[in-house]
């Protein structure tokens, strides 16, 4: 077995990896960095590994086994831009509160706004200030991920869509929720109350 195949075999069970991981594995075989870079280029060309962002990859084998697992996609979204959490339309769909089919995985981050278009999906990150980077939690499973509560997911969606609820009152917000076809009444009562508490400082009565 050639060194490139040996390295691929060692990487195939990782949910993601970066160049540093590959270099560390290659040290045991005394491979030079230039040689490893050639292996990476060749593996990308042969589609044995899939680029996620600059210097970050997943093996095609691992992705094929997990591509239908939503938790894996959310896990990768958290990894690509940290700190971040799943929110907005993506979280609302996760909670079965949105009727629209969502093609982009949307997250909220403390870093600058950014989009990653990858072969495993498109990831969109919206930047928010520290004081609003709240009300999300960790979902544990085979792939752990951070996601907004239902109330915060709706807050984040409308916060960015309306530019911080500019000029809106509570009735305007209710109408907008209806127009967006969000199943607000299906949301837990405590979450609905929490949402109205969240928007109180931004909207008029």
Annotate the PLM regions.
Residues 16, 85, 148:
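Short aromatic/basic micro-patch
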Residues 27, 96, 159-163:
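Hydrophobic/aromatic-lined pockets within catalytic cores
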Residues 33-35, 100-103, 168:
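Short, surface-exposed acidic
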Residues 51-61, 73-119, 125-129:
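Short gly/ser-rich loop at a beta-strand->alpha-helix junction or flexible surface loop bordering the NTP-binding
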Residues 1-81, 119, 134:
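Short beta-edge/loop segments at beta->alpha junctions of small alpha/beta modules
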Residues 134-205:
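Hydrophobic alpha-helical interaction segments
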């Amino acid at each position: 077995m050639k060194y490139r195949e040996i390295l691929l075999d060692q990487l195939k069970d990782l949910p993601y990896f970066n160049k540093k991981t590959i270099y560390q594995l290659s040290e045991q075989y005394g491979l030079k960095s230039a040689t490893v870079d050639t292996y990476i280029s060749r593996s990308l060309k042969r589609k044995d590994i899939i680029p996620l962002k600059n210097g970050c990859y997943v093996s095609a084998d691992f992705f094929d086994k997990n591509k239908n697992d939503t938790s894996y996609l959310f896990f990768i979204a958290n990894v690509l831009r940290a700190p971040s959490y799943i929110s907005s339309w993506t979280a609302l769909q996760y909670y079965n509160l949105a009727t629209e089919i969502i093609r982009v995985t949307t997250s909220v981050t403390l870093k600058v706004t950014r989009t990653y278009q990858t072969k495993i999906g498109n990831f969109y990150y919206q930047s928010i200030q520290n004081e609003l980077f709240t009300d999300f939690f960790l979902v544990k499973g085979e792939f752990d991920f951070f996601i907004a509560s239902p109330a915060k997911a709706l807050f984040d969606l409308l916060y960015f869509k309306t530019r911080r609820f500019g000029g809106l009152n509570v009735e305007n917000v209710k109408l907008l929720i209806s127009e967006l076809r969000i199943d607000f009444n299906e949301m837990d009562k405590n979450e609905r109350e929490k949402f109205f508490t969240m928007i109180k400082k931004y909207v008029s009565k």
